[in-house]
Every structure is written in structure tokens, then in C-alpha cells.
Amino acid sequence: MLEQLQTLKNEAETQINEASDLKTLNDLRVKYLGKKGPMTEIMKQMGKLSAEERPKMGSLANEVRTALTEAISSKQQILETEAINEKLKSETIDVTLPGTAPSIGTKHLLTQVIEEMEDMFIGMGYEIAEGPEVELDYYNFEALNLPKDHPARDMQDSFYITENTLLRTQTSPVQARTMEKHDFSKGPIKVICPGKVYRRDNDDATHSHQFTQIEGLVVGENITFADLKGTLTVLAKTMFGEEREIRLRPSFFPFTEPSVEMDISCFKCGGKGCRVCKGTGWIEILGSGMVHPNVLEMSGIDSTRYSGFAFGLGPERVAMLKYAVDDIRHLYTNDLRFTKQFQSTETGEI
């Protein structure tokens, strides 16, 4: 039995030392120290020994059991430490790697179009003029040759706040304010007026109660219709392509005389006629004309000495035509599926 205990101890310690994981180690514990293990069988055989041998062999058997228990416990600590270290190693975060960049917004399609036009006009020597969105009736209408009860006021159903104040229906009041305070000793007036405007329109695919306008104004000595045509030609070719042709049609606006509307040759069909141009080969873009003498005089400008031209267009219409947007409401519904299609490389201010 002594030899049996020593062989068992050596065999068990060897296998315990070679155990590579906790499951194997637990299997060895059950194998050698379990109820059906060899140590249990040896302890059962103690009763067959003589009274002299029994204490000695019992003490030796207990020493072997204690040694194996301690060996298993020691090996368990080693394997648990190795498992923890391996887990920490596999879950280590490399702080030198670049982090996940946050989602950064880019400029909205409408902002891109507005800034493209602003950059073009600034390059032509224009300045940007701004004014209040809550405007006096005088600047919104009367200073623009639209006196009270003028029938043309019916064309712009307005949001009145008080009897004499309203949400501006156009950015033309900025032109009136600019002319009123301008000092011609410092040069001619040459401004564009971008901004939000408001009209009591029913929202649909092509109309909105709030939209944007960019209006332009040039006033100085010897300003002619040819200057207006040249400016509109540059605008059309810059925004819609060098191959674009323009067409000017007579029209009526109370604040300009003569007044014209500008069409551009259809960029979809090349003038042959299609759904975009409604079969005409031309697409209406903006209204314009020479500043009416009455408007100049109401701003304190001598109409016999100074002349000028003005024009106005909607960036929404430009964006819809240029990027084939079929509903103006897409520009205002904040649907990321739509806006992500027109992401610019330049980030916006958030």
C-alpha cells in the first residue's frame, strides 16, 4: 500500500502540473480525490491492515491527500491568474489608435446654393446687405412704389403683425433702406440681399409660407439695361453651366421699369422640349428690371442723375432645378435620407 500511495501521488502531481485549464484541473480533482477515486478506495482498505500498520498508513494517506489538495489549489490559483491576464490582454484598448470620429454635420443643400451665389456676387464686387424680417409696411410696399390700396399688393398675401408692421414678403425692403442711407460720394450701390421672406401661401410641392430670396441692386451713374443683362448672363452660366443661354421676356413689377423675367435654356433637353421645361425649351428663373424712378426719388436719389437695376430669385427654385428636387418641402423636413444625398465636403457650424 505504501508503494501504491507513492505511485498515486507522483502520477497525480504530474498530471496536475500539466493541467492547462481549470476544467482539466477540476476533472483531476474528481478523478483522484472524488468519492470513486483511488484515495477513497485506499482509505476503505485501511480496515484490512494490522493494528500496527493502520496508524502509519493512515497518516501517510492523509499526507498524500493533503499534498494533492494543496497542489490542486496552487495550480488553480495559477490557472485563474493566467485566465485573468489573458482576458485583460485580449480586451486591452490601444490608446494610440485613432478614436471613432463623432458624426459632424455638413452644410444643408439650401445653404450651399445660397453661399455659392453669394461667393459669385462678392467676386463681382457686390456687398451683402441685411435687414429686419419684421418690417414696416412703408419699406415693404410704399417705398417700393406700392402705395396703399395698390392692386399689386394682392399678389403678396401678407402676415400682418400690426396695422403698419408685417413679416416681410420680399427682401426688397433691404434695398429701400440701403438706398435711403447711401452716400454716393463713396461710390455706387452694389449689394445683394439674401434672407427669409414670408407669404400666406398654402404649402405644396412648389410653394411655402416661408422661403428665401436673394435680391440684387445696383445704383449709380450711367447704369444701363446692358449692365443688367450682363450680370444675369454671368449668374445663369455660373449656376447652371457655361452652355446656358438666357432669354428676357417683358413683364411687370411695380418697383422696376422696364421689367423683364429671365429664362434659361433647358439644361435637361438642351432646348428641344421636355417635362422640366414644359415643352418650351426654356425655364423661368427670376424677375428683374431697371429701378423705377419713383423708387429712386422716394429714397432721396435724383433719378435724373442716377439709374440702376434690380433682380430677385429664390434659392429654393435654383436648388430644385439644379439638383432635380421635386418638392420644396424636402428642403425643410429635416429628413436625413434626403439631406445626406447633398453632403458638402465643408462642415457647417453646429
UniProtKB/Swiss-Prot annotation:
Under SUPFAM superfamilies, the record lists: Class II aaRS and biotin synthetases (SSF55681), tRNA-binding arm (SSF46589)
Report the Gene3D superfamilies cross-referenced here. Answer: Bira Bifunctional Protein, Domain 2
Q: Which InterPro entries does the record cross-reference, listed alphabetically? A: aa-tRNA-synth_II (IPR006195), aa-tRNA-synth_II/BPL/LPL (IPR045864), Phe-tRNA-synth_IIc_asu (IPR004529), Phe-tRNA_ligase_II_N (IPR004188), Phe_tRNA_ligase_alpha1_bac (IPR022911), Phenylalanyl-tRNA_Synthase (IPR002319), tRNA-bd_arm (IPR010978)
One Pfam family it belongs to: Phe_tRNA-synt_N
Q: Which family does it belong to?
A: Belongs to the class-II aminoacyl-tRNA synthetase family. Phe-tRNA synthetase alpha subunit type 1 subfamily.
HAMAP family xref list: Phe_tRNA_synth_alpha1
For this entry, the protein name equals Phenylalanine--tRNA ligase alpha subunit
What organism does the record attribute this protein to?
Listeria monocytogenes serotype 4b (strain F2365)
Tell me the lineage of the source organism.
Bacteria, Bacillati, Bacillota, Bacilli, Bacillales
User: What gene does the UniProt entry assign to this protein?
Assistant: pheS
